[in-house]
Amino acid sequence: MNCSRDTGDELMAALLAEGINLILPPRDNIAPGDLIIADPQGGARLGGWHEVFNLQLSPEVATDPGFKSFQFRASSILQVGVAASVMGRVLQALGLGSGSFSSAFSSSNADTIQLSIVAPANKELTNFDAVLVQMNEAKAEPAQGYTDRNFFVVTKVWRARGIRISVADKSKKQVDLSAKAVEELTAKAKMELKREDTGSYAFLAASQLIFGLTLREVTYKDGAIVDVAPTGPLKFRGKGPGDPFAFIGDDAFVDLPES
């Protein structure tokens, strides 16, 4: 199932506003300053500066444990079928399971579900412009075989502990999940489903996992490495002059193989 950014949902809109690419499959080996290499056929993989430009760079990273730039963490109130599909993809991105969750809610008189992110945090590359200067001072250019590729610098790594769901019936009253629903959700998520004191339920990982990346595109043009807006099939969103974000493809998820 593809998950378009343009869903009308508030959580997806917040991810869009932050320029977040949700990442598949989940892993814990991506850091701010890393490089993603995209080929003309639309594939993408994690690479390295030394591999492409024969340089060793020194990225500076700051941690924002308060996630202060991300103002909205809850989804719209979604119909069960829609929410179950989105939930499956989000859990997959967090490495907490996959598949359709629609049938799990049928035994609980569930009509709507609201999703939220648990314990979000990020790490940010703070010297992006200085990295570009360093590359150009070294007269860096792509090695043979990389001249037709697109390059994306990871400027932020977004992490979360899991997702929280709040379930309501047709009268908008919060309801508990049935034992059957808990059993099925636990099996599909491959982890414990915890009921919280508020009546919500949380899928929690043992530690914070990467669920998204913010990217900036760089290219080699006229003898220099420059930061540019993507073209062609790539999606571009800018918050203002000098602050562009790069999206890879129409899907909200970036399929980025381990190797």
UniProtKB/Swiss-Prot annotation:
Q: Describe its PTM?
A: Palmitoylation helps stabilize the inactive state; may self palmitoylate. Palmitoylation plays a significant role in pore formation.
Q: Does the keyword Lipoprotein apply?
A: yes
Recorded GO cellular component terms are:
cytoplasm; plasma membrane
A GO biological process this protein is involved in? defense response to virus
The record lists the membrane-crossing segments as: 70-86, 98-116, 162-179, 187-203
Q: Where is the lipid attached (S-palmitoyl cysteine)?
A: C3
Keywords associated with the record: Antiviral defense, Cell inner membrane, Cell membrane, Cytoplasm, Lipoprotein, Membrane, Palmitate, Transmembrane, Transmembrane beta strand
* Spans annotated as C-terminal region: 244-259
Q: What is known of its domains?
A: The N-terminus has marked structural similarity to the mammalian gasdermin N-terminal domain. The C-terminal region wraps around the twisted beta sheet core, probably stabilizing the inactive state. The beta-stranded transmembrane 'fingers' of the active protein form by local refolding of several alpha helices found only in the inactive state. Reorientation of the N-terminus probably flips the palmitoyl moiety for insertion into the membrane.
What's this protein's family per the entry?
Belongs to the bacterial gasdermin family.
Name assigned to this protein: Gasdermin bGSDM
Species, as recorded: Bradyrhizobium tropiciagri
